C-alpha cells in the first residue's frame, strides 16, 4: 500500500462543493479543512504508485480544485 496526503487549494466560493466531491473519490480515506496556504487536505491510500498517480490527477480535475501538492509517505 502507498499512502499520501494531497494539499489542495480551492476556488473561492467552491470550497464546500470541492470537499464533497473529493470525499467521494475512491481511495480517499479522510478529507479535512485546514488554515494556511491550503484549504483542504485529503489522506489517500492506493495499491501502488501506479494507482496513486491517476487518483491524484482525478482530484486535481475536480470542480473547484485549483492547485494540488502531493506528499507521498516513505518508509523510515
For the regions a language model picked out, list residue spans one by one.
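A compositional/biophysical signature of low hydrophobicity enriched in polar/charged and small residues
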Residues: 1-76
Amino acid at each position: 500500500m502507498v499512502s499520501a496526503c494531497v494539499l489542495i487549494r480551492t476556488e473561492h466560493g467552491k470550497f464546500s462543493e470541492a470537499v464533497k466531491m473529493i470525499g467521494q473519490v475512491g481511495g480517499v480515506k479522510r478529507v479535512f479543512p485546514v488554515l494556511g496556504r491550503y484549504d483542504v487536505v485529503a489522506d489517500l491510500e492506493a495499491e501502488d504508485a501506479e494507482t496513486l498517480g491517476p487518483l491524484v490527477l482525478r482530484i486535481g480535475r475536480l470542480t473547484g480544485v485549483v492547485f494540488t501538492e502531493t506528499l507521498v509517505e516513505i518508509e523510515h
